[in-house]
Each structure stands twice: as C-alpha cells, then as structure tokens.
Amino acid sequence: IHLSLWFYIFLHLIHARMINKIGILCTYSFPEGMAPTIRILSYGQGLVDNGCKVEVVIFQPKVGDNAYSLSGYVGGVKYTYAHKRDTNKSKLYKLFVDRPKSLLNAIKKIRNSHKEEKFDCILLSFDYPIYLLFFAPVLRIIGIKVGFIGDEFPEPIRRLKSSIPFSYKLAYKFVYQFISFRVLMTEALQRFYNELVCEKPTYILCSILNTARFDGIVKQKVSRKYMCYMGNMMLAKDNVDNIIRAFKRVCDDFSDVDLYLYGTPNDKDKSIVEGVISELGLGNRVFIKGRIDYNLVPQTLANAEILVTSQPATKRAAGGFPTKLEEYMMSHTPAIVTNVGEIHYYVQDNNTVYLVEPYDDVAYAEKMRYILSHPQEAKEVAGRAYNYAIANFGSKEVTKKLIDFLDNTL
C-alpha cells in the first residue's frame, strides 16, 4: 500500500503544472487596441484562468489618450507601460530620449518583478529586429527564458514584399541563440522560421478568444438592418472594396439592409474606400462607422444580418489567421469569409461559415443573396460556428494546451 501511495504521489508530481508566472512584452496599445491587443489580452486571461500569473509590459512610449491608466489589472492580467511619451517634444527627442528610456524602463520593470517572483518565461510579441536584438540577450542575461509569439510574417512581407532583407535574416539568426521556443499562428509561419532561421520547439495557436465576452449576448432589434465588416480596413490586409462591390450587386433586391464598415483606415485607404462607395452610388447604403468601443463589439456583431470579411490572396494572408473570424463565429451571426491561408483547415463552407474565393465579388454577392434568402439555414450554420469556436478557440482551453507545451519545453 505504501509503495502504491508513493507511486501515485510520484506520478502526480511529474504531471503537476510547473508554469506559474509568464511575462508578455509588446509594442502596441493595451488593454484596448486592434487585433494584436485582443489576442494578447485573450492569451493573458486564459493563462490567468489556468492559475498562472501574467504581466504585460508595453515598451512603446504611450501615444494619445486612453481610458485606462498606465498600469493596472484587466481580467486578472497585470499590465504596465514602461514610459509615457511627452507628445510636445520633437521627433529627435522622442527618438534619442523617449525610446531609450522606454527600453531601459521595460527591462527595469521586468527585472524588479523577476526579483519578487521569478518569471518562467517572457514572450516577445514583436518581430522588429532592433528590439529583438536588445531584449532577447538582455533577458537571458537576467536569467529569464525567452519565447517568441508570431501571428504574421515580418514587416516587409506585411507590406506585401516577397521576402525580408538579408540584414533581417542575420539579425534573426543571432537573436534565436537566446530564444527557446515559438508560439506561431500558422504552419506557414513555422515553415518560414524553420527554413529561414532555425528550428525551435513550436506551438501552433491559430486563434484565441475570451469567449466570456459573448456571454448573454442575444440579437436585438435595430432601427435598420445591416451587414457588418469589422477590422482595421487596411486594404493590403482586408480588401474591403471587394465587399462593397459585392454588396452593390444585391443591395437593390434587399433594400432594407445596409452595409456598415467598422474600422479606422489610414487616410489613403479611407480615400480609396470612399471613392468606391461614391463610384457605385452607395453613399446612402454603405457607411464607414469608424472605431467601435471594445465592449460594444459583441452586441454589434450579434445584431447584424451577415458578418463579412475579405482578404486578398497574398503571402501575408498565408501567414496569418483573421482574429475577427472567431469573434464573428461567437456572435451567432452567419459569416462570409474568403478562402485564403489556412482558414480551410478549421472551417468548412456551408457548415460553420460561408467560404468564397478571393477577389470574386460575383461569388461573394451570391453568398450574401443566399444567406438573406435562407435565414433558417444560415442560423443553423451560425449555431455550428458558435459551438466550434467555444470548443476550439476559447482562451482557457487553448492556453491550457499552451501551458502543457511550456511544461514540456522549458
């Protein structure tokens, strides 16, 4: 009996969770922001739900006003900005004073927190070589293991280039001497880094969402029915013009449904979108709604007749997975999605979403028409999408697997 008890205790110790505290270092706005912010917040809340402590350090100098303070807790996730930029200073001051202060303060905050309770690892959620060259070696010198989170190809490819400069390759090869593992969004990214830099233990995490945001959300009556696009409206990433042209083909047959575009495009992209709207005579049917409050997203998606997104078939699209897709699927609203990258690995046409090939506004319009003409069937598809998202994209479930990966890797 005693031997059996000791054997049970031994097995329990082997399988016990060893990951207790994780840091995430990033450059973008937090806790409010676009897709990268939403993903990191979902990572953090999922890890917290699984019993980990999570600290997010934002080292880019803070820009603009934010409803949140420079440090605090959101959903159990601790966050802090390394430095607040003085927006009245010159560009040279920001470059040579603000930026170094931010980098050094980030290290100081991480080191102090590490002294209080050791980090099991720090996840670097950026791919800029100059920052990787600074943070990865310094963190290892401090005694913290380092991992890399990647949800897109590096910057030149995000700008629709076919490859990255030779200098980037050299920088990555050096930096990865200090990085222990990767958490990547797609298999395409894994192949890219394995072939370009070196192989590392890799966990594929295509999508993640704090599903609790959608608890209790039901469709409400609205004064005017609408289809909804929600994203950053960057045309290199989301060719919204394809959606508008498709809508033009069906709008006369469904005169009670408008098209709402939520997002904050840059001036150039906004001008192009406005030009397409004007060219097609849709000024009274298609509306650029601007940025929407993070907390209003679930209800806005749920109230729509159709959720739409469109991506061009680019190398950039091959490396990523649209964060908006899991939000769409959680809303109980039917969604039209372009079949690019690895999306078809996870969703099926007419089963969980409505897939359409990229650039084909005629086929896209037919999907719109079909959904609006078959509301009951579309509702069933949306219901299956919700169940799939709960089972496969929920932050607690996904990060539990991530913790298992880290336990076996670190």
What are these regions (language model features)?
Residues 23-25, 220-238, 243-247, 260:
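Conserved donor-binding/catalytic core segment of Leloir-type glycosyltransferases
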Residues 145, 172-217, 230-231, 286:
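Donor nucleotide-sugar binding/catalytic pocket of nucleotide-sugar-dependent glycosyltransferases
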Residues 230, 258-272:
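Glycosyltransferase donor-sugar binding loop
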Residues 271-296:
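Nucleotide-activated donor-binding/catalytic signature segment of Leloir-type glycosyltransferases, i.e.
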Residues 301-318, 333:
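Acidic donor-binding loop of glycosyltransferase active sites
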Residues 306-309, 327-330, 334-337, 354:
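Short hydrophobic beta-strand element within catalytic cores of glycosyltransferases
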Residues 349-361, 370-375:
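Conserved acidic donor-binding segment of nucleotide-sugar-dependent glycosyltransferases
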